[in-house]
């Protein structure tokens, strides 16, 4: 039957990408339908029970700054929080949380069910409705046809998914869930360029069978013995520690030579080493057999025993993802200290699935071949909940904007890790599952977790993503930061009004001439609290006190202090951004035949002709396109007088 109601946006899949896509489109006012094969698995954490980490936590903060769900759900479900790299600079500090799977999923489900403009429907999608070169809807497994102006596909590992345990394999989207075979076949019919990737998960262990006295305890921040014992982190800009459930520790054990012998003995029955698995696995989350093979010189690897929740005994042994036969899994687990009597609740497995080359997507994640069809998440060759959530949000935003008849939202590489993620995917593609790191961002001093809201919330408000409560909190923070920064810049101290002993205590020596407080705060060893506490607190401001700002007080002071400490570095990076901006925004003529650009090598011509980048900046990031080739292309465009290009260039120069 044809469903009587028509939608603006249909989202296929209810994982981390699908939920953020559906929520974003609905927040923007689009009539949105989320189709999932099982409503009970909305927001399910299919692999590790954690959110965040280096680079990943930055993405979660950006999703949150745009009104997304992941950070708030983590605050509600997080049973251990840690700030990674806390001793390093703010650009690379990252929040990571262990999450209670049940609490996290319940938080996501509640947000979906209470979101205006969003309808949920339980049915697997088998086909797309395509008229000419445009998608017009989706068809479910029982033949229900839903019409829509746009479709966002977030199928995760379900596209022709195949699970491997030893030399045994079977079709599945994940353990216990069926694959999307018909939909995968339909996408192949549309001749979208695709490949195979794989990922894996470890066996789960019953905590009652673990001897924790033989393991090393790893408490989180805010817990006795934690690295930052006095401070319990919060993930969302709208979150609070009051939202957190009870906090619990993780535990650490290690593999040993016996473990490695057991693993090596199973290589002849490993689907990875016998050619049963075609797909490439994630480099930065390798299976334990891959680790033992690649790092043969290491006699031990750290294994983190992570609790799956407060109401279960299940533990996730992070570090032994495997597709080895179950008898090998059983022996390798029991060879480790503290796990000698471990009972395995679920076997580990590898899953192989289809992905589609993200270089065939436009800058807004719309497919080039089919108008109105957007891809997000693991279907684009990424790995990780956080990367999926960020892509889902991005695709949902742009599907809604297309329905409004508005131009796409395309954050730049200097504006957001989301911009880095999108740009990397559409220009470089993937040869292995893509994971975000801070090292992928050229301008990471500007792209910190702490300022994600300062970078993105205003854009989110303009697009309709940010509600009044979030906007009010952001506005108070932004205004307080501006006022306090200005106050410090206009407050002066000199040898006459600042006692020498106070100056020496806080600054290390007495001052000899006049300084404003902001300049003094730029000194590496001077903290905001010490500076404003000089001379009996004479320079403190009640405007940024906890009594005035409540929970916003600490983030405001942090922003002011970072702005002072890193002012010189950030200014230099802004100059680099300006230089990059010139190339980034130069639109390349769509009619340009790269094969006729004689100055370029055949390899470069072929790559440009194949990928057809939209801007000179995108062209510069295609693998094999050298800076010299970019310069030659620029010369060719200037000489050729391509329509719009020379005028556009003149506008840039004038600006």
Curated annotation (Swiss-Prot):
Record key words, sorted: Cytoplasm, FAD, Flavoprotein, NAD, tRNA processing
Intracellular or extracellular location(s): Cytoplasm
GO molecular function: flavin adenine dinucleotide binding
Pfam families xref list: GIDA, GIDA_C_1st, SAM_GIDA_C
Keyword match Hydrolase: no
Any Gene Ontology biological process: tRNA methylation
Cofactor(s) the record lists: FAD
Main location: cytoplasm
Domain of life, per lineage: Bacteria
Gene Ontology, cellular component aspect: cytosol
Residues that coordinate or bind NAD(+): 281-295
KW Cytoplasm (keyword) present: yes
Annotated PANTHER family: GLUCOSE INHIBITED DIVISION PROTEIN A, PROTEIN MTO1 HOMOLOG, MITOCHONDRIAL
Function: NAD-binding protein involved in the addition of a carboxymethylaminomethyl (cmnm) group at the wobble position (U34) of certain tRNAs, forming tRNA-cmnm(5)s(2)U34.
Quaternary structure annotation from Swiss-Prot or TrEMBL: Homodimer. Heterotetramer of two MnmE and two MnmG subunits.
UniProt-listed NCBIfam families: mnmG_gidA
Protein's UniProt name: tRNA uridine 5-carboxymethylaminomethyl modification enzyme MnmG
């Amino acid at each position: 039957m044809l469903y009587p109601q028509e939608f603006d946006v249909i989202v296929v899949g209810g994982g981390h990408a699908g939920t953020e896509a559906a929520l974003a489109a609905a927040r923007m006012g689009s009539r949105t339908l989320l189709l999932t094969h099982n409503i009970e698995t909305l927001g399910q954490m299919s692999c590790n029970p954690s959110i965040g980490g280096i680079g990943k936590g930055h993405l979660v903060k950006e999703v949150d700054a745009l009104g997304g769900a992941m950070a708030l759900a983590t605050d509600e479900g997080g049973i251990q929080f840690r700030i990674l790299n806390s001793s390093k600079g703010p650009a690379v500090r990252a929040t990571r949380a262990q999450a209670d799977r049940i609490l996290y999923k319940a938080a996501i489900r509640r947000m979906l069910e209470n979101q205006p403009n969003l309808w949920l429907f339980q049915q697997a999608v088998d086909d797309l409705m395509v008229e000419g070169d445009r998608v017009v809807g989706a068809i479910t497994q029982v033949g229900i046809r839903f019409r829509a102006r746009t479709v966002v596909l977030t199928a995760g590992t379900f596209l022709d998914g195949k699970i491997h345990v030893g030399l045994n394999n079977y079709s599945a989207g994940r353990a216990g869930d069926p694959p999307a075979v018909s939909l995968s076949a339909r996408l192949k019919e549309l001749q979208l360029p695709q490949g195979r990737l794989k990922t894996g998960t470890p066996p789960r262990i019953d905590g009652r069978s673990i001897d924790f006295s033989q393991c090393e305890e790893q408490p989180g921040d805010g817990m006795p013995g934690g690295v930052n014992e006095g401070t319990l982190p919060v993930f969302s800009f709208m979150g609070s520690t009051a939202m957190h459930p009870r906090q619990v520790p993780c535990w650490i054990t290690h593999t040993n030579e016996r473990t490695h012998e057991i693993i090596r003995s199973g290589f002849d029955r490993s689907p990875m080493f016998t050619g049963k698995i075609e797909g490439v696995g994630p480099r930065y989350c390798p299976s334990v057999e891959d680790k033992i093979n690649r790092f043969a010189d290491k006699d031990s690897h750290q294994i983190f025993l992570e609790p799956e929740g407060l109401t279960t005994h299940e533990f996730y042994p992070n570090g032994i993802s495997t597709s080895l036969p179950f008898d090998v899994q059983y022996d390798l687990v029991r060879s480790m200290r503290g796990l000698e009597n471990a009972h395995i609740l679920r076997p580990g497995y590898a899953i192989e699935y289809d992905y589609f080359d993200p270089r065939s997507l436009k800058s807004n994640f719309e497919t080039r071949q089919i108008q109105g069809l957007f891809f997000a998440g693991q279907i684009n060759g990424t790995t990780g909940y956080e990367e999926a959530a960020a892509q889902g949000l991005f695709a949902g935003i742009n599907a809604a904007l297309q329905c409004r008849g508005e131009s796409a939202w395309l954050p730049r590489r200097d504006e957001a890790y989301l911009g880095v993620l999108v740009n990397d995917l559409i220009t470089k593609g993937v040869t292995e599952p893509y994971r975000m790191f801070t090292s992928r961002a050229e301008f990471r001093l500007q792209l910190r977790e702490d300022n994600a809201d300062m970078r993105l919330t205003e854009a989110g408000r303009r697009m309709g993503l940010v509600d009044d409560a979030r906007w009010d909190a952001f506005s108070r923070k932004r205004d307080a930061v501006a006022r306090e920064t200005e106050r410090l810049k206009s407050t002066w101290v000199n040898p006459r009004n600042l006692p020498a002993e106070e100056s020496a205590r806080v600054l290390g020596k007495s001052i000899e001439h006049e300084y404003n407080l902001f300049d003094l705060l730029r000194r590496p060893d001077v903290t905001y609290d010490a500076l404003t506490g000089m001379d009996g607190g004479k320079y403190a401001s009640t405007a940024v006190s906890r009594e005035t700002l409540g929970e916003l007080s600490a983030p405001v002071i942090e922003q002011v202090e970072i702005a002072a400490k890193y002012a010189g570095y950030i200014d230099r990076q802004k100059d680099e951004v300006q230089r990059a901006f010139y190339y980034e925004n130069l639109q390349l003529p769509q009619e340009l035949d790269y094969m006729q650009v004689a100055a370029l090598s055949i390899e470069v011509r072929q790559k440009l002709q194949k990928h057809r980048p939209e801007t000179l900046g995108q062209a510069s990031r295609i693998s094999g396109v050298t800076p010299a080739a970019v310069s030659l292309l620029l010369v060719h465009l200037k000489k050729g007088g391509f329509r719009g290009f020379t005028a556009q260039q003149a506008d840039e120069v004038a600006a």
